[in-house]
Structure formats: C-alpha cells, structure tokens
Amino acid sequence: MTKSELIERLAGQQSHVPAKAVEDAVKEMLEHMAATLADGERIEIRGFGSFSLHYRAPRVGRNPKTGDKVELDGKYVPHFKPGKELRDRANIYG
C-alpha cells in the first residue's frame, strides 16, 4: 500500500472528514515520525511495532559496475520491529 492508497482508504472510511484533511493528517504524522527518528528517538506504537535507528558499521563494499573496492562510512538506518499483535495478525496468512 502506498501513501496515496492509505490516504484514499482512510478518506473513504471517514466520509465526514474532507479528503484534504486526511491527507494533511497523514503527511503531518509521517513528517513527525521522520523528525523524531532524525533526533535519535525511538517510536513505539503498542500492538503495532516500534521504529528505531540501527547503526551500520563502516565496511568495504564493491562497485557493482567495476568490481573495485569502495570504503563505505558507518551510518544509521531506520529499523522497524513489528509488535506481537501485528505479527500474530500477519501470521494468519502464513
């Protein structure tokens, strides 16, 4: 599901709320989540999961075109860990 599809589905379920208000709310929520992670904070949504940053250590990679070795710097990457309720709901299809 894309962000546009999410907005469309939520707007369809909330007929009393204008679609533009739903779009603004979704965009604001995602922006706030990104800013929170950028500040190094963890986000926990009970029953759904948690978002945090994981550190990737510096390493030697390879240029896929030339095969040359490339030094890659260490960096933080977003990480999502699903909560138990979400894992259980997803496993009904597995």
From Swiss-Prot:
It holds the Pfam family Bac_DNA_binding. PROSITE patterns: HISTONE_LIKE (PS00045). One of its GO terms (cellular component) is cytosol. InterPro entries: Hist_DNA-bd, Histone-like_DNA-bd_CS, IHF-like_DNA-bd_dom_sf, IHF_beta. The keyword Transcription regulation applies. It comes from the Bacteria. Keywords: DNA recombination, DNA-binding, Transcription, Transcription regulation, Translation regulation. One of its GO terms (biological process) is DNA recombination. GO terms for molecular function: DNA binding; structural constituent of chromatin. Belongs to the bacterial histone-like protein family. PANTHER family: DNA-BINDING PROTEIN HU, INTEGRATION HOST FACTOR SUBUNIT BETA. Heterodimer of an alpha and a beta chain. This protein is one of the two subunits of integration host factor, a specific DNA-binding protein that functions in genetic recombination as well as in transcriptional and translational control. This is Integration host factor subunit beta. It comes from Serratia proteamaculans (strain 568). The gene is ihfB.
